Amino acid sequence: MKTFVAKPHEVKRDWFVIDAKGKVLGRVASEVAHRLRGKHKPEFTPHVDTGDYIVIINAADIVVTGNKAQDKKYFRHTTYPGGIRETNFEKMQQRFPGRAIQKAVKGMLPKGPLGYAMIKKLKVYAGAEHPHTAQQPKPLEF
């Protein structure tokens, strides 16, 4: 008996939609990363992108527990000397509602070309509307 190895052109991908309204950031991010990677499928292969497409709606209404809204820091750099900038979760949500969930999921995916391909299958929208109705995404509850 041989171990099954998925081939990139034979992978069947589904579309799922997740309503993030009132859900905790880390719990949503870990489930999304799991599904983007394809670990929920029996044909999972570590070196092949076997994951599904995920659409997250209501990203502006995602929550964090405790004092993380003020205490959690996000860093970026302007590429100029001394150009490090920091912002907290609250300000990030006001300015870019989908970026916090995107950064959380990206940190949970593999680094390198395979991880970059996986994060492209994540679509995040601040409101309840999304342009992917033609793909008929199935609602995902957890």
Swiss-Prot record:
<keyword id="KW-0687">Ribonucleoprotein</keyword>
<dbReference type="GO" id="GO:0017148">
    <property type="term" value="P:negative regulation of translation"/>
</dbReference>
<dbReference type="InterPro" id="IPR005822">
    <property type="entry name" value="Ribosomal_uL13"/>
</dbReference>
<comment type="function">
    <text>This protein is one of the early assembly proteins of the 50S ribosomal subunit, although it is not seen to bind rRNA by itself. It is important during the early stages of 50S assembly.</text>
</comment>
<comment type="subunit">
    <text>Part of the 50S ribosomal subunit.</text>
</comment>
<protein>
    <recommendedName>
        <fullName>Large ribosomal subunit protein uL13</fullName>
    </recommendedName>
</protein>
<dbReference type="InterPro" id="IPR005823">
    <property type="entry name" value="Ribosomal_uL13_bac-type"/>
</dbReference>
<dbReference type="GO" id="GO:0003729">
    <property type="term" value="F:mRNA binding"/>
</dbReference>
<dbReference type="GO" id="GO:0006412">
    <property type="term" value="P:translation"/>
</dbReference>
<dbReference type="GO" id="GO:0022625">
    <property type="term" value="C:cytosolic large ribosomal subunit"/>
</dbReference>
<dbReference type="GO" id="GO:0003735">
    <property type="term" value="F:structural constituent of ribosome"/>
</dbReference>
<dbReference type="Pfam" id="PF00572">
    <property type="entry name" value="Ribosomal_L13"/>
</dbReference>
<keyword id="KW-0689">Ribosomal protein</keyword>
<comment type="similarity">
    <text>Belongs to the universal ribosomal protein uL13 family.</text>
</comment>
<dbReference type="InterPro" id="IPR036899">
    <property type="entry name" value="Ribosomal_uL13_sf"/>
</dbReference>
